[in-house]
A protein has these predicted regions:
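Alpha-helical support elements that line or immediately flank enzyme active sites
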Residues: 197-203, 217
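Phosphate-interacting basic helix/loop segments used at nucleotide- and nucleic-acid interfaces
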Residues: 58, 195-196
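Residue-level signature of outer-membrane beta-barrel architecture
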Residues: 64-66, 77, 96, 100, ...
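Surface-exposed loop/interface segments of Gram-negative outer-membrane beta-barrel transport/assembly proteins
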Residues: 1-42, 52, 82-87, 93-194, ...
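Outer-membrane beta-barrel initiation region
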Residues: 48-53, 59-66, 154
Length: 312
């Protein structure tokens, strides 16, 4: 067999018997061991991988006026199940806004938001470590049955089973992992905490002269994890990265709007603005593989783990 081939060139489905990729596991798949199957179109083609995505949203909000202050509080949650198995996004948003008359001349308004966003397996694209589109549409063979790929992607002892094996005696992947191995074993996830908002004050000296001061802030902390399981085409690894970012804007303005007659008003202002921003990330990753399978920790690195960082 030409095990180096990881693509199809359109051979006719003529029913010729051949040994499929799952016909070499005597221990765990004795019912298929060395049993040929006809060369034919798969019963479960690439559409078997996909499912209907589901988006569940719910929210509650409360508004109240107390004296000269108007308050609004809202809490929302959004959960999205992706069209590819084992992919998910969840977002929770807490929001508070207000406006208040503090005196005859002084007013204040603002709003604050706190958002927690979690994602599971967000990076399944044309890459070496997440070859979903690559395996299904670029480098693959058209006779593959997706149900078989799903049912047999992992042996009971944890061994990776892929259609793209190196040889009859060597079941390790030559070029590509089983797509279901990627989805359930080579996983990634991230979680972000974000806080942003603004607060402002307006002071009226006269009917034509007033001052405005505002502060805008946006802060987030993002933690990401990426895993390559033992037995994958790529070297087993674990990478964890922490990102932090803060952005603040300050502005102050003095407005003057005199009336220069019955039908004519002049509008002008002077002001100052300042921006402060900070960004940094810290990353740690294993090297040379993982000592123990299914244990993702930097201390499980075969060689000394490495770290890097950046700050601006």
């Amino acid at each position: 067999a030409a095990y180096e081939s990881d693509e199809s060139w359109g051979p006719e489905y003529d029913g010729t018997p051949y040994l499929p990729w799952y016909a070499f596991d005597e221990k765990y798949l004795p019912q298929h061991y060395l049993k040929p199957v006809p060369w034919q179109a798969p019963k479960n083609d690439v559409d078997k991988l996909y499912r209907t995505g589901v988006n569940l949203s719910n929210s509650v909000s409360v508004s109240r006026a107390v004296g000269g202050t108007n308050l609004r509080f809202s809490l929302g949650n959004n959960e999205v199940t992706g069209i590819i198995p084992n992919t998910k996004l969840e977002k929770t948003n807490l929001s508070i806004s207000f406006n208040s008359t503090l005196s005859k001349k002084l007013k204040s308004e603002g709003g604050f938001n706190y958002i927690i966003t979690s994602r599971e397996n967000p990076e399944n694209s044309y890459t070496m470590k997440n070859p979903i589109s690559k395996v299904l549409y670029a480098w693959t063979q058209r006779q593959l049955d997706l149900q078989k790929l799903q049912d047999y992607y992992k042996a009971p002892d944890g061994t990776h089973r892929t259609w793209n094996r190196k040889s009859a005696d060597d079941g390790t992947p030559r070029y590509a992992d089983n797509p279901y191995w990627t989805l359930y074993e080579n996983t990634s996830n991230d979680k972000r905490h974000r806080f942003f908002g603004n607060i402002g004050f307006t002071y009226n000296f006269t009917d034509n002269l007033y001052w405005v001061g505002k502060i805008y802030g946006d802060i987030y902390a993002l933690n990401t994890e990426a895993r390559v399981a033992v037995g994958s085409k790529e070297t087993a690894s674990y990478v964890v990265t922490n990102y932090t970012n803060s952005d603040f804007n300050y502005e102050t303005r003095l407005h003057y709007t005199p009336k220069l007659g019955k039908d004519f008003t002049l509008t002008g202002f002077i002001g100052l603005a300042r921006r402060e921003g900070r960004y940094q990330w810290v990353q740690g990753k294993t090297n040379g593989g993982l000592v123990l399978p299914d244990f993702y920790n930097l201390e499980n690195s075969v060689e000394t783990p490495s770290s890097s960082n950046y700050r601006s």
